[in-house]
Amino acid sequence: MLGTALRRCAVAAASRAGPRGLQHPAPVPGPTAAIQSIRCYSHGSHETDEEFDARWVTYFNKPDIDAWELRKGMNTLVGYDLVPEPKIIDAALRACRRLNDFASAVRILEVVKDKAGPHKEIYPYVIQELRPTLNELGISTPEELGLDKV
């Protein structure tokens, strides 16, 4: 398997060489070549949407989550090119409540609105789905706080 990966990387390197080929003999692969070849060769499994959602719900449902982990998780989640599902946001809001972090809860809702971008129907749908949770936890939306007018 490692030999196959080394050959693939060598073929890729040779194809990137100029039209006259390599100007000097190719070096013999050393111990670092194995590390590089493994990085060139990736065949990981793809995560389904359900697995993705379950992973993030589990992350935010950790009973011992702290404020730093909450912010780190939200920063990572915001980095993806998607609007999180309401069940993920629900878990994140409940984590905020466990931490008594009202500001982070409101910020999460602001981020969801920002991630929805020009698709004006997404944010109202998310708020509609989260309304029971927001009422239960006593969390106001940015619009209810007047933050959308600032």
Curated annotation (Swiss-Prot):
GO cellular component entries: mitochondrial inner membrane; respiratory chain complex IV
Transit peptide region: 1-41
Segments traversing the membrane: none
Residue ranges of the motif SIFI-degron: 2-17
Keyword Transport: no
Pfam families: COX5A
InterPro entries in alphabetical order: Cyt_c_oxidase_su5A/6, Cyt_c_oxidase_su5A/6_sf
Pathway field: Energy metabolism; oxidative phosphorylation
Modified residues (Phosphothreonine): T141
Gene Ontology molecular-function annotations: metal ion binding
Membrane topology, from the record: Peripheral membrane protein
Compartment(s): Mitochondrion inner membrane
Positions where N6-acetyllysine occurs in the chain: K87, K113
Entry keywords, A to Z: Acetylation, Heme, Iron, Membrane, Metal-binding, Mitochondrion, Mitochondrion inner membrane, Phosphoprotein, Transit peptide, Ubl conjugation
Free-text description of this protein's post-translational modifications in UniProt: In response to mitochondrial stress, the precursor protein is ubiquitinated by the SIFI complex in the cytoplasm before mitochondrial import, leading to its degradation. Within the SIFI complex, UBR4 initiates ubiquitin chain that are further elongated or branched by KCMF1.
Main location: mitochondrion
GO biological process: mitochondrial electron transport, cytochrome c to oxygen
Subunit structure of this chain's protein: Component of the cytochrome c oxidase (complex IV, CIV), a multisubunit enzyme composed of 14 subunits. The complex is composed of a catalytic core of 3 subunits MT-CO1, MT-CO2 and MT-CO3, encoded in the mitochondrial DNA, and 11 supernumerary subunits COX4I, COX5A, COX5B, COX6A, COX6B, COX6C, COX7A, COX7B, COX7C, COX8 and NDUFA4, which are encoded in the nuclear genome.
Purpose: Component of the cytochrome c oxidase, the last enzyme in the mitochondrial electron transport chain which drives oxidative phosphorylation. The respiratory chain contains 3 multisubunit complexes succinate dehydrogenase (complex II, CII), ubiquinol-cytochrome c oxidoreductase (cytochrome b-c1 complex, complex III, CIII) and cytochrome c oxidase (complex IV, CIV), that cooperate to transfer electrons derived from NADH and succinate to molecular oxygen, creating an electrochemical gradient over the inner membrane that drives transmembrane transport and the ATP synthase.
Family label: Belongs to the cytochrome c oxidase subunit 5A family.
Name the record gives this protein: Cytochrome c oxidase subunit 5A, mitochondrial
Underlying gene: COX5A
